[in-house]
A protein has these predicted regions:
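Bacterial N-terminal signal peptides that target proteins for export
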Residues: 2-11
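Hydrophobic h-region of N-terminal signal peptides that target proteins for export
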Residues: 15-23
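Accessory terminal and edge-of-domain segments that mediate assembly/interaction
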Residues: 25-360
Length: 360
């Protein structure tokens, strides 16, 4: 073989090897500005009764779908950098889904903001169905000891008490190790400031009629509004005046009087836990998490109705589901859009620490 022919063959072989190497390189991860976290959908993704996800699918430019080994596929607006996730119901599913997304090599989530936008039960002492609450404290309602109330000492108010303590609300409790998480105060206050004057939907006659039953609670009868209020997450869907009293005291106990129980659902401590672990390995920034919960039902019955009667009635359909889903979309969208529009600043500096005059 001539020297010239040998050189030609070497060049061809090198070109082939380089093309193989290029083909083997994974694509660059897609940078995501905002992840919207929803928990469930009622039926199809579009065109029927809406759960937490459907309005995002119908109203946003989520043109790109990514198969996802979770509850549902992932949907992306590639122009705005908006990714929407459905975790499934419960802390176990939310923790698993968030961890799976956080480790997904297809996405760069290092600068992403995470906005939980879901429905919840609401304390009638604080707000009405359709209202929207931004949480600063997430308190876990599962990590505890429990004795059946029929077997507890006479001077105990509840059978629930913190691990490694001797009675309910024992002041000698250990530091929280999953029982309570605090979000970024500045970011939460900023989100509330952007949305506190929004007029929320209030067109559902059934929701209005149900609100009117809560004659002992002034805030429960108000038209929907935006507030700040803290959250209990538990795998048990609890209901009733006594459990509502426990939730208020539980939040007060773990936040040392700084928090106020307002909403109850089943996922957010799992979401925070996974983000906190992903934060340790540099995959996300947990200080960029926001939790918005909108009221689909009350956490206790109105006067003259038992807890069992009210819960069973709600199981047939939440009295405020439609307006809660709409409120979640409208309030969360306001914050999502602000984050995207202000990305030149918010990519590297959290809104709560930004002088608003510096924004474009």
């Amino acid at each position: 073989m001539s020297k010239q022919r040998l050189q030609q063959n070497c060049v061809i072989a090198l070109a082939v090897l380089m093309s193989w190497a290029a083909a083997a390189e994974p694509p660059e991860p897609i940078p995501v500005k905002v992840v919207v976290v929803t928990m469930f959908e009622v039926g199809a993704d579009e065109g029927d009764r809406a759960g937490e996800f459907q309005l995002w699918k119908e109203r946003r430019n989520l043109t790109k779908t990514f198969p996802f080994m979770g509850y549902r596929d992932l949907y992306l607006d590639p122009e705005k950098g908006l990714l929407v996730l459905v975790t499934g119901i419960g802390t176990a599913r939310s923790a698993a889904a968030i961890m799976a997304l956080g480790m997904d090599p297809r996405f760069d989530l290092t600068k992403s903001y995470w906005v939980v936008a879901g429905i919840a039960g609401i304390d009638p002492e604080d707000a009405s169905i359709g209202s929207a609450a931004w949480a600063e404290y997430l308190v876990d309602g599962d990590l505890s000891h429990e004795i059946d109330a029929r077997e507890i000492p006479e001077d105990w108010p509840f059978g629930y008490f913190a691990r490694y303590t001797k009675r309910p609300f024992d002041v000698d409790k250990p530091a929280p190790t999953g029982e309570m998480y605090q979000l970024n105060t500045g970011l939460v206050n900023w989100a509330f400031a952007q949305t506190k004057n929004l007029t929320l939907p209030d067109t559902d006659a059934h929701a209005k009629a149900h609100r009117a039953l809560y004659t002992d609670h002034v805030n429960a009868q108000r038209p929907p509004f935006v507030l700040k209020g803290d959250h209990v997450a538990a795998l048990t869907f609890w209901h009733g005046a006594l459990m509502n009293d426990w939730a208020n005291q539980w939040v007060d106990y773990w936040t040392q009087g700084r928090g106020e129980f307002v909403s109850s659902a089943m996922e957010d401590t799992g979401t925070y836990l996974s983000l906190s672990w992903l934060n340790r390995v540099g995959r996300v920034d947990v200080s960029r998490l926001l939790v918005l919960r909108t009221a689909s039902n009350y956490t206790m019955p109105p006067p003259g109705v038992t807890a069992a009667e009210n819960l069973l009635a709600e199981n047939k359909g939440y009295s405020g589901l439609a307006i809660a889903v709409e409120s979640a979309y409208q309030v969360a969208s306001t914050v999502v859009d602000q984050l995207i529009v202000g990305w030149a600043v918010y990519e590297n500096q959290l809104p709560g620490a930004v002088d608003q005059k510096d924004l474009p």
